[in-house]
């Protein structure tokens, strides 16, 4: 079993440490996987498309620009991720249906909750490098999450 603290000790010069504070909403507190990215503004169509197409074990990183206008993820989309065996979802934005999310057996991190739903226009970008939390989130890098933090590595550190 790995811990982010141990990975930081062992691979200190090879990691990025996310400086953003997230809240955990999913059933899993610890998760890791290869990163896939989505950048959107108050629109979760590309989030849904990503969840429906990404391979098992992936972590979808959603940059919603920390917008407080709406939630980008709720129980329906999280259930798709669970059904498809994704490792987790990290949202630089907000979620809703939090009482249901805690029963979804994946990792889910977000800034907080917002009851308002997103628009459905399909605007945004997928598979691009993102910048938030003081780190660069690049597709196909690896992210490791537990109760102590979020770290990113260009290579797999744990199998």
Curated annotation (Swiss-Prot):
A divalent metal cation binds at residue 97. GO terms for biological process: regulation of RNA metabolic process. It catalyses: 4-hydroxy-4-methyl-2-oxoglutarate = 2 pyruvate; oxaloacetate + H(+) = pyruvate + CO2. Keywords: Lyase, Metal-binding. It is an enzyme of class 4 (lyase). One of its GO terms (molecular function) is ribonuclease inhibitor activity. Divalent metal cation. Catalyzes the aldol cleavage of 4-hydroxy-4-methyl-2-oxoglutarate (HMG) into 2 molecules of pyruvate. Also contains a secondary oxaloacetate (OAA) decarboxylase activity due to the common pyruvate enolate transition state formed following C-C bond cleavage in the retro-aldol and decarboxylation reactions. Homotrimer. Belongs to the class II aldolase/RraA-like family. NCBIfam families: NOT-MenG (TIGR01935), PRK09372.1 (NF006875). This is Putative 4-hydroxy-4-methyl-2-oxoglutarate aldolase. It comes from Bacillus cereus (strain ZK / E33L). The lineage of its organism: Bacteria, Bacillati, Bacillota, Bacilli, Bacillales.
């Amino acid at each position: 079993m790995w811990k982010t603290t141990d990975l930081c000790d062992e691979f200190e010069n090879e990691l990025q440490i996310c400086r953003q504070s997230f809240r955990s909403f999913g059933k899993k507190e610890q998760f890791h996987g290869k990163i896939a990215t989505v950048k959107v503004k108050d629109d979760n169509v590309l989030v849904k498309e990503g969840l429906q197409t990404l391979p098992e074990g992936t972590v979808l990183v959603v940059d919603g620009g920390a917008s407080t206008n709406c939630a980008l993820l709720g129980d329906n989309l999280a259930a798709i991720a669970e059904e498809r065996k994704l490792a987790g979802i990290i949202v630089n934005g907000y979620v809703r249906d939090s009482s249901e999310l805690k029963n979804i057996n994946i990792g889910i991190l977000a800034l907080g909750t917002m009851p308002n739903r997103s628009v459905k226009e399909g605007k945004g970008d997928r598979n691009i490098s993102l910048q938030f939390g003081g780190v660069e989130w690049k597709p196909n890098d690896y992210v490791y999450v537990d109760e102590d933090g979020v770290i990113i590595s260009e290579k797999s550190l744990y199998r």
